[in-house]
Amino acid sequence: MRVAIIEFVTLDGVSQGPGSATEDTSDGFTRGGWLVPSIDEQFVRRASDWLDLADGLLLGRRTYEAFARDWPQIAEPDPFTERMNTLPKYVVTNTLAEGSWNPTTVLRGDPVETVAALKSQPGRELQVHGSARLGAALLSAGLVDTLRLVVAPAVIGSGRRLFTHPSESVGLRLRSHAATATGLLLLEYETTGVAPLADYAGVTELVDPDRAA
């Protein structure tokens, strides 16, 4: 299977609490709900298409517990609820004895090793939703194939950042991009190994001399 990370993030890199003021108040965070004003039909269609690619959800404990609390309580039909509730869930944790949001498998031990073993099985995508710390660890370990970001037109100024302390550099190739009418950026990247580096040597070779004249 391939591993895909799906993250909502502000322009200043905050990934905490996109859905509501009470979604994640850890560390005193009070500015949740920053994604909601920008949700529109184009975003819903794209996010639904992404979820259609999943054969399982790969979650950290904190995100798993929040999802297990909230998703089963959603009664009205929408493009996500049934799939979120019925997809296999894999929660990476050494502190949770068992899962309450079925079907759930608890992956104990070293996160990189357990996810690598799961990734080796046949299937389409294992999708990391939220779970920024888990996503960063997997990205650094070279286990992530695809990174999908929804960038909200907001600067929050506080909260947990996405990929704050990755231990390895990662190169990305842009595969698709779109902007919604409300200002959301929908970005999809594929990983390309270590991020390339170079020394700046001017742009002369990149400029068409006829246009420059």
What spans do the regions from the language model cover?
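Portal/gating segments that form or line small-molecule/metal binding sites
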Residues: M1-L143, P153-A213
